Regions:
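Phosphate/ATP-binding catalytic cores across multiple sugar-kinase/actin-like superfamilies
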Residues: 212-235
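A mobile "lid/hinge" subdomain adjacent to the ATP/sugar-phosphate binding pocket shared
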Residues: 176-206
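Flexible beta->alpha loop and helix N-cap segments adjacent to enzyme active/binding sites
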Residues: 6-38, 76-87, 91-99, 104-178, ...
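Extreme N-terminal starter segment of soluble prokaryotic enzymes
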Residues: 1-5
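Short acidic-aromatic active-site loops that bind/stabilize oxyanions
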Residues: 89, 204-220, 409, 413
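Phosphate- and other anionic-substrate recognition elements at nucleic-acid/protein interfaces
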Residues: 42, 46, 61-86
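Short glycine-rich phosphate-binding loop at a beta-alpha junction
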Residues: 54-68, 232-240, 317
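N-terminal phosphate-binding loop and adjacent alpha-helix
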Residues: 29-55
Length: 470
């Protein structure tokens, strides 16, 4: 048996990936243990390998929470006399793992990390790789800048979620372009201080404008970073900041981007595995690769019943196959709803999701019909914002007229494609509101128990329909 292992040992969203005689395996600790953004212990990695029947990998590569100095790990849990996992091992820095995680042969690679690489004393937020050069981009991580705004509003929960929440709020404000061009790592804290003293809320219009201004500053920083690339050649992108759909959409207007769904730290293990193997490899059924419980494929009868319930206005859970890679629901771990229901966003939020009032919901659309409803017709991983081209889709239309949508083809997700097609047959609309199968503060579901979310009318596990949710 030949075994290669990659460990994404980070401060949050830890994971492990392996090639075992060519068979790909992936497990994320938050899904496995039910703790959002979980940071795994070394023993969890060892237990996972035991579950997979692995005792001693032929080659193991790991990231050491960004704490690499001169190519050497600060701590040595996977090598030396005290190693908890025996085998040939190497430690790589955070950015290097992100870079390899794209599994792309693109000539240009961009790593844009939210907080900077600890492997370089926390000073660098970006890594640019072109055929001619490698450039460390020195700037305070834009994710950290947006996190400060979450502290101003006294957000609860984990700060790794703050930038995503701010991304939704910025649409309610109007940026001051002159100020945005001046905001940097030296003055951001001073600019936030008056708002902290004032004690603002998310509905304060002046603060919404400030949020929009800081977000615009982050966009300008990232546009400057990308200006070093050749816009005519593909850029493979990674790093948690690349989950920002607003900025991604601006970049897309000028550059050819490949952004995989696992750009965040949950993809580090895949990058570490790529480094261990030394070459790209195929991942079957990508991105539906979570090591979790998977029910049987739904029948045509089940698809018809689910589509009918959605057409009638019910909110349903949709748990099919293995879970998707990354933080976005892509049709296997989803809460679904008819996107034409009046006040649908508020109904869903009050009954089920219980998120901040300003945060929008995404949508999924049949790939071949996308251009009729959105101005971006290819978005398989929900990583761009598109302008909504028709009226009457209020539950999925943000205040700025955009929607973060997923395009679904039969090849990408057959079961979900069939459901969307059947819903279109019943309603004339090939779109469903799609949000992740979880509630605030919890990870996306990985088994029956975690999927039984209060407030759903019903949930489908393959062909099994459950109606007693709470």
């Amino acid at each position: 048996m030949t075994v290669f292992v990659g460990i994404g040992d980070a401060a949050h969203d830890t994971s492990i990936a392996a090639l075992i005689d060519g068979e790909f395996k992936y497990r994320k600790s938050e899904r496995n243990l039910g703790v959002k953004h979980h940071e795994a212990s070394e023993n969890w990695y060892k237990q996972t390998l035991n579950d997979w029947g692995v005792d001693k990998p032929d080659r193991l590569c790991y990231t050491d929470k960004g704490k690499v100095r001169g190519g050497k790990s600060v701590r040595k849990p996977y090598n030396g006399e005290d190693a908890i996992i025996e085998g040939d091992s190497v430690c790589i820095d955070h950015h290097t793992a992100h870079l390899h995680s794209t599994l792309s042969n693109a000539e240009q690679h961009a790593v844009f990390d939210g907080r900077g690489s600890g492997g370089n004393n926390g000073r660098y937020t970006g890594l640019i790789v072109t055929p001619d050069e490698k450039i460390r981009y020195k700037h305070l991580g834009v994710g950290k800048m947006l996190t400060y705004l979450g502290h101003v509003l006294d957000f609860k929960g984990l700060k790794v979620d703050f930038p995503g929440k701010i991304m939704g709020l910025q649409a309610y404000g109007t940026p001051d372009l002159e100020l945005a061009s001046q905001i940097n790592q030296d003055n951001i804290l001073d600019l936030c201080e008056p708002w902290i003293k004032k004690g603002v809320t998310s509905k304060d219009k002046d603060f919404q404008n400030f949020v929009a201004t800081v977000h615009k500053a982050c966009e300008l920083i990232q546009l400057d970073y990308f200006s070093k690339f050749d816009p005519d050649k593909l850029i493979a992108c990674s790093g948690g900041v690349m989950l920002n759909t607003v900025i991604n959409t601006e970049l897309r207007k000028k550059y050819k981007l490949y952004i995989p769904p696992h750009v965040y730290d949950g993809g580090l293990s895949i990058g570490a595995l790529r480094y261990a193997v030394g070459k790209d490899f195929e991942i079957p059924n990508f991105p539906y690769i979570q090591d979790d419980w998977a029910p049987e494929e739904p029948s045509d009868q089940t698809i018809d019943e689910a589509a009918e319930l959605l057409a009638q206005g019910h909110i349903i859970g949709w748990y099919q196959g293995h879970g998707e890679l990354g933080p976005r629901a892509l049709g296997n771990r989803s809460i679904l709803m008819n996107p034409t229901i009046p006040n649908g966003k508020d109904i869903l939020n009050e009954r089920v999701k219980k998120r901040e009032w300003w945060r929008p919901f995404g949508a999924s659309v049949l790939h071949e019909a996308a251009s009729k409803y959105f101005d971006i017709d290819d978005s398989p991983y929900m990583l761009y914002n598109s302008n909504v081209l028709v009226n009457g889709l209020d539950p999925i239309t943000h205040v700025d007229g955009t929607c973060r949508h997923q395009t679904v083809s039969e090849a990408s997700n057959s079961s979900f494609y069939r459901l969307l097609s059947k819903f279109e047959e019943k309603t004339g609309l090939p779109i469903l509101l799609n949000t992740s199968l979880n509630v605030g503060g919890k990870p996306i579901a990985s088994d029956k128990n975690s999927a039984m979310v209060d407030g759903l009318d019903c949930i489908f596990f393959g062909n099994e329909k459950c109606t007693k949710i709470s």
